Amino acid sequence: MSALRKFVSSAAMKRAAFLLFYPFLLAAFQPEANDVYPYIKNESFRRGEYLEYRMHYGIFNIGKGTVKIHDDYAEMNQRKCFKVDVFGRTTGVVDWVADVNDQWGAYIDTAALVPHMSYRKIREGRYKKDEVILFDHEKRKITAKVLDQKTRQYKEPVVYDAPPQVRDLIGGFMFMRTHDFSKRKINDTIVVSGFFEDEFYRLKVLYLGKETVKVKAGKFQAVVLKPIMPANKIFDGENSVTVWFSDDKNFIPLKVSANMFIGSAGVELTSFSGLRNPPRLLQ
């Protein structure tokens, strides 16, 4: 229990929701294309989908997360969009020590699966951040606006030059689920780049093949990916994170496992509804 107290009172707990969002960060990166809005074939998700996850540290449940694709289409920049919201929060006794209640959302182009706008509402103990990111894919610009918590007015926006079809976490999540891994070989390396928290990243991801994985939501055949982690103060080594996606047409994140400097943590799928395709559950 002392290790749990240390974990929830640390800066790592303040960022625990990152474990839920990490599969989306992997997906945010893709090779560049020439078209402004290249069509991405999507047979993996639809409006009305709902995914629920639990976050744990060792044997202790510390939080839950949800991913929701809204029932109605939205419109932005005269383009039809999915509206997607991701929520992550601590639960139970952990709330008393380190209350986390985060919301991440985006308007995602239904044809190209790129974001037109994304937003974050971060509530982690006393720390608060409200941010809006606007994507202009025609001009290749990203505009970031952060709310001043005292005046409740947005600060001076910051504008970045962007590569074609740049994605955020949510847009990356949608894009990843359309990827075909059937022709990948074990230990293939995918070199990817994208935009997250005011920075552009390049990251290597290893494809480790397929295996059976059991989570609360059921037993699945899964695609296994391992990002090569850059040096940081949270995850223990470059091979510290593993991600499992369902090996079916839905390609939903099933599980994330992370070795941290102060213990092991993870995320797993607990329930789902509104999937576009029947899930391939194993007996």
Question: Where are the regions a protein language model picked out?
Answer:
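General helical structural elements
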Residues: S9, F18-L19, E124
